[in-house]
Amino acid sequence: NQPKQYKHSLIHNDYKYDNVVFSSDSWTKINSILDWEMCTIGDPLMDLGTSIAYWAMASDPKVLKAAFDYPTSLEGNPSRLEVVEMYEKQTGEPVNNLVFYYVFGLFKIAVIVQQIYYRYSKGLTTNEKFKNLNKIAEILCKIGWQSIQKNRIENLF
């Protein structure tokens, strides 16, 4: 279900909670976006797909919530679908092929964590939090497969 046509824009390519700085007077206002080394020209929905792939929810497997230790799984945060609805409202554009963008985001993150795990397994980095990243990559792929099979991005297990 890869989109046949898409828009082009500058995309961040790693848009997630720990790459934004929130306003000191409002946690819902972003003051700046950090970490632009992966930016490129591409489909802006790729940023949305990556963001919701990082978006851990309370209903997700525990290991995924532990891997992405973001406040997104806490009560009061929107679900992935609610994030997509907000995106549609802000842009005035429908998000078609949502599963494609979500699964692409999961795959991209799986590749990133495999690269980090490889460096850890070769002793090139020693941070113990990297020792289970190979399992995280496997889980991300399973989530992607479930998303494709069920044609949705939530309630996959």
List each language-model region with its residue ranges.
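Short, solvent-exposed loop/turn segments at secondary-structure junctions
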Residues: 16-18, 39, 105
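All-alpha amphipathic helical-bundle segments outside canonical DNA-binding/catalytic cores
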Residues: 94-105
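A cross-family kinase active-site recognition segment
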Residues: 1-9, 38-42, 124-137
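Regulatory N- and C-terminal appendages and interdomain linkers associated
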Residues: 111, 115-157
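Catalytic activation segment of kinase domains across protein kinase-like and atypical kinase folds
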Residues: 20-62
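An alpha-helical support segment within catalytic cores of ATP-dependent transferases
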Residues: 1-13, 17, 23-28, 85-92
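Active-site activation/catalytic loop segments of kinase-like enzymes and analogous catalytic loops
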Residues: 46-91, 105-122
